[in-house]
Amino acid sequence: MLSRTIDRSVLRLYNTGLRTYAQAAKKQYDIVVVGGGIVGTASAREILLRHPSLKVAVVEKEHKLAFHQSGHNSGVIHAGIYYKPGSLKAKLCVEGLHLSYKYFDEKNIPYKKVGKLIVATNDVEVERLNDLYKRSLANNVPDVQLVDAKRIKEIEPYCQGLKAIWSPHTGIVDWGLVTEYYGKDFRQAGGDVHLNFEVAKFEESKDPNYPIVVKSKRNETVQSKYILTCGGLQSDKVAELTGCSPLPKIVPFRGEYLLLNPDKCHLVKGNIYPVPDPRFPFLGVHFTPRMDGSVWLGPNAVLAFKREGYKWSDINLFELFDAIKFPGFIKMALKYVGAGMQEMAKSALIPLQVKELQKFIPDVQDYDVKRGPAGVRAQALDNDGNLVDDFVFDQGKGDNALAKNILHCRNAPSPGATSSLAIAKMIADKLENQFNIK
């Protein structure tokens, strides 16, 4: 009797092993995450840590994680000052700030809590600054203060201004490195990462247990019960592959930085930002210290002629035409034509950017800077030319597997990196609720 019981147990284990082996051979998963940026990787990590029995994979088109936006940014840990109270951005940024610092300490990831000054240099900016301070209080930004000219000098000896917001918990970190740590956690928990897997199509399979097939441009396939897409610069295109609306549309904007010469880096201790002008969609040029001791200046914001175009010479005519023929882009361009021309001029002429920087640190001269790296921001637009300024989630239309079993993260702009652990928790909640994952 005991022998038969043992035999049945061994047989069950054997059959379970065969099924697991077959799944691995066919690359069958409970959840596949499309996109190995910081949001996709953090989300894959979170769902697997919650449900270690699930088979989860990340597919990423590049040869490494965090290759685009997650690895090409200023490296700032934001505190949640700018965002509309009650928005997901405001909530998730403040939550993500605390989660990030806790995670960095647990993993011994290097970071610096250098703080940030948002500096007003005239009376009009002082009025805007006061409104921004009220917003930061509404958002529960930790320990934020309104400081005078004397205190500005105490914090940043070479900076001038009438008044400023001081955020002591704003910091800097290498977000590409952080994404690698998320990926390491994910792999150690049993997750699979498929690199060089550029998604070409989604199809319904004939297997009811794994109803979705994801095919790459190299004709590789994975099957899955459920799909989460976090496509970043390609998020609208990925969503369209499943029959989703093309909106919001992604239009790429390149942000070009200058580098401060090493012998002048002592002029900057922490992040120094201008007061944002509500008439324009971007924050303006600022001073950002880096983990390696360098200081980045900028960025500007110019239309990229390619979705992943980090230089003026990076041009894809199909992608460029796709952007400029979009009605929302045309309306936005007309709305911001003056600002757009200024940004292009600043891109071509370094002295114009330096002039902006001298409002805060007069000691910076044209010969103290040189051209530096660039990043590309996935800016989501609606049909009316409005910049979509919060996180957007979507799923397909209809009653098929591609509609019912897929969740798209359509827009995760700055402060997406700071918010990544908080976004991951929210996405995991959505996956559990939408797909009844226990």
Question: Locations of the language-model features?
Answer:
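Helical element adjacent to the flavin cofactor pocket in flavoenzyme catalytic cores
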Residues: 165-226, 230-237, 421-432
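Active-site lid/adjacent beta-loop-alpha segment flanking the redox-cofactor pocket in flavoenzymes
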Residues: 266-373
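Flavin-dependent oxidoreductases
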Residues: 42, 202-316
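Beta1/beta-strand and adjacent pyrophosphate-binding region of the FAD-binding site
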Residues: 25-39, 57
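Glycine-rich FAD pyrophosphate-binding loop
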Residues: 48-71
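Short beta-strand to alpha-helix junction loop
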Residues: 84-95, 119-128, 166-185, 194, ...
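C-terminal catalytic lobe of FAD-dependent flavoproteins
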Residues: 327, 332-438
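Dinucleotide-binding Rossmann-like beta1-alpha1 core, especially the glycine-rich loop
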Residues: 75-151, 155, 161, 284-285, ...
